[in-house]
Amino acid sequence: MGLTSQLLPPLFFLLACAGNFAHGHNCHIALREIIETLNSLTEQKTLCTKLTITDILAASKNTTEKETFCRAATVLRQFYSHHEKDTRCLGASAQQFHRHKQLIRFLKRLDRNLWGLAGLNSCPVKEASQSTLEDFLERLKTIMREKYSKCSS
């Protein structure tokens, strides 16, 4: 049984509407998860949050939103890959060790979600100014909250 020509336009319309709804809904969910992760990260005070990271957010005037997300994910990946086993971050106590492992887990989650929003395979990151991880995450949280308010309106 084939589709009649009368049914095709309404079906395409329904598919287009469903796609737009799903895209907006996914944007909403992804941003909410990123903001929740950033909230958890900025509440944590670990030895690693005082270390420096390449601050791509300070020099993001001529970049697209997707490039900014891609570069943020890239510098976060560089940071947690380099500091995952850093003795300055691990601390001496079991509690400090646990906090560090939790920080790395949250950074990996944030990296994954930013890559999903960026939708790019790779992006170059030039050496820029440095800031603490804590300041970088606060600025990223502000950007994500602004995007969330635009996405949900």
Curated annotation (Swiss-Prot):
One of its GO terms (cellular component) is extracellular space. Disulfide bonds join 27-151, 48-89, 70-123. SMART domains: IL4_13. It is found in: Secreted. Participates in at least several B-cell activation processes as well as of other cell types. It is a costimulator of DNA-synthesis. It induces the expression of class II MHC molecules on resting B-cells. It enhances both secretion and cell surface expression of IgE and IgG1. It also regulates the expression of the low affinity Fc receptor for IgE (CD23) on both lymphocytes and monocytes. Positively regulates IL31RA expression in macrophages. Stimulates autophagy in dendritic cells by interfering with mTORC1 signaling and through the induction of RUFY4. GO terms for biological process: B cell activation; immune response; interleukin-4-mediated signaling pathway; negative regulation of inflammatory response; positive regulation of DNA-templated transcription; positive regulation of macroautophagy; regulation of immune response. Belongs to the IL-4/IL-13 family. Keywords: B-cell activation, Cytokine, Disulfide bond, Glycoprotein, Growth factor, Secreted, Signal. This is Interleukin-4. The keyword Cell membrane does not apply. GO terms for molecular function: cytokine activity; growth factor activity; interleukin-4 receptor binding. The keyword Coiled coil does not apply. Residues 1-24 form the signal peptide.
